[in-house]
From Swiss-Prot:
This is Transaldolase. One of its GO terms (molecular function) is transaldolase activity. GO terms for cellular component: cytoplasm. The gene is tal. Keywords: Cytoplasm, Pentose shunt, Schiff base, Transferase. It is found in: Cytoplasm. One of its GO terms (biological process) is carbohydrate metabolic process. Transaldolase is important for the balance of metabolites in the pentose-phosphate pathway. It is an enzyme of class 2 (transferase). It holds the Pfam family TAL_FSA.
């Protein structure tokens, strides 16, 4: 049996679930996903519109299926839904042994609702239920963005007994709203008679994009004090989010009542962990965010960097919230408007996924049109 890379094994031992932020048919067919499970501690997969747009635009892995769907008269939305849910279902099957071995904590695969629905509560709920039924695997997570319209959708979908990955969380305030939606949804699920131990949720907190936006603003200020704060906000923000998670899931009476009925914690998931600034360590958003009951979803480049030279020294979050708050106090003192930062990041996050989805729609439509000639 293949052995796990020591640095990634150390990360797992410290309580961090290693998930891969990528999926493609080639990765499934070639056995590469299984290889990453066997050698790089991967116990889950996340997808998003950008990942599927890239997968479908490269190579010819989807051509035969798209041609078959075209022959059947499928429109572009149905075509994309079929090919993406097929990949996700197959990934769920590859990860099923990890799901079983972890008692349902890991072995999870995420698929996102159409990003064009990010500000429409009812349509998000409807599509989440549809995707859950189409994929039809217990280790699926439905990704719903943490927009204001997304929060009630999250609660409603959980109430149906459906597992949810809440995505596009940038601020601790919004993270608190997400945890509240989780508790509300689980309370309703309990009232409806669902087995709470079967419902899983993670809260995907984006890291590197926070640094990118705040670093740009610090460079515009340009003072020595401002420049000295570059590269600190992303990690500090995530550490404050973990402290908020501990408040709710280690002491809140609402959660304790649900826990007695089998509910699990809603784990923080560190997303956007690929380092975008070449001046920073390429493992920064992994080694600095180690704590029990967390998930880190990584692009393969980051996964490889951690395997090669990531130094994992155990828990690097617990007890750091005071220092993290100081970073934020300094940012505000020199004129960084944090609420504006988070508003910009959320709207940009939705726009990026919408743009990827449009590219995917346009490319698939062109393929369908060519086949119709």
């Amino acid at each position: 049996m293949a052995s796990q890379k020591p640095n990634l094994a150390a990360l797992s031992a410290a309580g961090v679930s290693v998930w891969l932020d990528d999926l493609s048919r080639d990765r499934l067919r070639s056995g590469n996903l299984q290889e990453l499970i066997d050698t790089k501690s991967v116990v889950g997969v996340t997808t998003n519109p950008s990942i599927f747009q890239k997968a479908l635009s490269e190579g010819h892995d989807y051509d035969a299926q798209v041609a078959e769907l075209a022959e059947r008269g499928a429109d572009v939305d149905a075509t994309i839904r079929t090919v993406t849910t097929d990949d996700v279902r197959n990934a769920c099957d590859v990860l099923a042994p990890r799901w079983e071995a972890s008692g349902g904590v890991d072995g999870r695969v995420s698929i996102e609702v159409d990003p064009r629905l990010a500000h429409e509560t009812d349509k998000t709920i409807q599509q989440a239920v549809e995707l859950w039924k189409i994929v039809d695997r217990p280790n699926l997570l439905i990704k719903i963005p943490a927009t204001k319209a997304g929060l009630p959708a999250i609660a409603a979908v959980l109430a149906e007994g459906i597992s949810v990955n809440v995505t596009l969380i940038f601020s601790v305030d919004r993270h608190r709203g997400v945890m509240d939606a989780y508790l509300t949804g689980m309370e309703k699920a309990a009232q409806a008679g669902h087995d709470l131990s079967k419902i899983h949720s993670v809260a995907s907190f984006f890291v590197s994009r926070v640094d990118t936006e705040i670093d740009n603003r610090l460079e515009q200020i340009g003072s020595a004090e401002a420049l000295a704060l570059r590269g600190q906000a992303g990690v500090a923000n995530a550490r404050l989010a973990y402290a908020a998670y501990q408040e709710v899931f280690e002491g809140d009476a609402r959660y304790q009542a649900l826990k007695e009925r089998g509910a699990r914690v809603q784990r923080p998931l560190w997303a956007s962990t690929g380092v975008k600034n070449p001046d920073y360590s390429d493992t920064l958003y992994v080694t600095e965010l180690v704590a029990p009951h967390t998930v880190n979803t990584m692009p393969e480049k980051t996964l490889d960097a951690v395997a090669d030279h990531g130094v994992v020294k155990g828990d690097s979050i617990t007890g750091t919230s005071g220092d993290a708050q100081q970073v934020f106090d300094k940012l505000e003192a020199i004129g960084i408007d944090l609420s504006d930062v988070f508003d910009v990041l959320e709207s940009e996050g939705v726009e990026k996924f919408e743009a990827s989805w449009k590219e995917l729609l346009d490319a698939t439509q062109a393929q369908l049109d060519a086949l119709a000639k």
